[in-house]
Amino acid sequence: MTDIIWGNGQKIISTDSFRINVTHRKDGNYDEYPDSVKIIISGVDLPGLSDNKSDWTVENLQSVIINAFLKCEIDSKTPEGDLIAKVSHSGAAGY
């Protein structure tokens, strides 16, 4: 099964990465995740953001990620501890 975390987008780092304030973790995750972590985006399901990474800008990411409640499905972790994940908007009540 895929590990999943939820939280609020905090800071855009680059055109394909941001920092998330983790507020929820899926029961049964294989790994443990800190309260704040860098996400490198492997894929998106975010209204207002193209599926094509080459179209992304810092401004695009800011408009759909900052202060949004996000779901991150973890693909892998870098040696530095950054998470590579598919990112989508998540409803607060149902995660």
PLM regions: where:
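Small beta-barrel nucleic-acid-binding modules, primarily SNase/OB-fold domains
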Residues: 1-95
